């Protein structure tokens, strides 16, 4: 990929997303699409009550238009992998939109039930995996970072594993979306990691267009989502991002890299699981002051901006480690 091929998707997506925000936020305010805040969260978060949600539509639009405008040559040549990744993420975005719509409609912080979300997400994951296998883009050879080796799995085992990873990733990103600018800031380095992969790894230029558009879209969204946020991405945005992260990892055929680039998502999710499990086992005791992890640090006295900065730095470190973990794969 040349310099312009790297930069252009970022810039175009940033501009489109920023413009979309100017139009979308007033519309969301007019429609009274305000976020309902959980009463079990930090009390000072109640001041965020009514902030427009579903803002993820901004970068979904920005990314979509960018890959159509800049990726049409690849599509004319019969290469659709970047479009598949986008459409897969979009399906999760639609699931999130339905959830957000239910919350806004009923003015409550509960939308779809956990079972409804799981069934829809699992169906989307299976459909994506079947499409990728049909197109010859999926392999049961599981790449192991650092060792530059593969574990050959039976197809059935691999597909079950892959579906679990996809649904888990999507929900982990969703859990991370709890502070102004947190999920978007943490995901920018991950998008950059996948963009770098497209630059150094011949044959993945199409994914570079999507990854660049993802980075630009998130930066455009942060114009409005940084503290104090004028808009939240909602489940519309967070489920889209989770779908995008999972789809990119499988499109590059290295899903285990998510352990490194998604270290923040994993820590957030584990803190939630550990807190709930320990609470039940000990009949009311807690390990963390509040879960997920970003709320724990808030309760320790950290400002939102500090939590976001530190978590983003951890994400950057995870992505740098991930680069060296897979370096041997493309350094031949």
For each predicted feature, which ranges?
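Short aromatic-rich membrane-water interface segments that cap or initiate transmembrane helices
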Residues: 49-51, 145-157
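Membrane-interface loops
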Residues: 25-42
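Peri-membrane helix termini and adjoining interfacial loops of integral membrane proteins
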Residues: 32-37, 100, 135-143, 287-288
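Juxtamembrane helix-capping/reentrant segments at transmembrane boundaries
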Residues: 38-52, 107-120, 294, 299
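Alpha-helical transmembrane segments
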Residues: 1-29, 59-97, 128-135, 156-332
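Hydrophobic transmembrane alpha-helix segments characteristic of membrane transport
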Residues: 98-106
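Membrane-interface helix termini and inter-helical loops of multi-pass transporters
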Residues: 74-77, 105, 136-150, 330-332
